[in-house]
Amino acid sequence: QPYSYRDPHTVGAPEAFFTRIPRSHVYGWTGIQVMNFNSLFQLDTLRRNHDSALAAADKLLFMPDALSYMLTGQMVTEYTIASTAQLVNANTCRLEDALLQEIGLTQAHFGRFVYPGEKIGGLTEEVQRITGLGAVPVIAVAGHVAAVPAMDRNFAYLSSGTWSLMGVETDAPVITAETESLNFTNEGGVEGTIRLLKNICGMWLLERCRTEWGEIPYSELIVEAGTCEPFRSLINPDDALFTNPANMEQAIKTYCSDYRQPIPMTHGQIVRCIFESLALRYRQVLDSLRNLSPRPVEALHVIG
């Protein structure tokens, strides 16, 4: 039975892991933003809970690698998704043995390590028969990379969805005391690049509210929000309160009450609070990126 990545079974998992290996060591190796649901902490949680599936596992495949396996019969571990999992050393671009050892795994539990652009194999005979295709080669793609069209390299991107990913592309990891303090991530990219970015809670806030409200059309909510007083109430979208609350509208109201702000009462006020809070958070992260990036940030590309 699979877990949702927002399942509370990993609450406190990073802190439990850091009692054995200091956070500074883990970040120094991986450069990855510490989040409860990183695969490193999920696997460690399974290990601590004596999970029978993990104990019996011969190979571990990330979702993109599982799809490649279904197509080719070849078990591989693709670099970018393994990097995001917080299992890769950002400087060697290989799985970090010290982390694997701590969660009771070895290199043998993972498939052949591949990078974007490498050939994984060809379609299996069964897939060829089902699809009518021939022995088409299957090439490894970046299993966890947001793409953005750009004419030059002096840009930042904002991939806006359930999560908002804001970052820049760099030629090498940026792993410093400041990036660790700000909890920025250095995810492996294509052609030797690194994506220095921050994961921000995005439209999850609005999606959950809409679910509670009966899927009111976005257009109606936006019009109503436009009639409301600006900057009346603001939240920190990344507060743990909003990770997976039983009721998102109530969580927003609770936050505003706790911080002695006017409590948003109407749908429009709540939507305006969400949008303005996200916009301010984006501005805050963009300012940090300008200071951290080795190149000037001259444009922001927003995709979704």
Report residues per predicted region.
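Glycine-rich Rossmann NAD(P)(H)-binding loop
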Residues: I303
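Short linear loop/turn motifs
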Residues: G111-K119, I222-G226
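Helix-loop-beta segment of a Rossmann-like dinucleotide-binding subdomain
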Residues: T77-S83
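Short, glycine/charge-rich flexible loops or terminal/linker lids adjacent to PRPP-binding catalytic cores
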Residues: D7, G121-E126
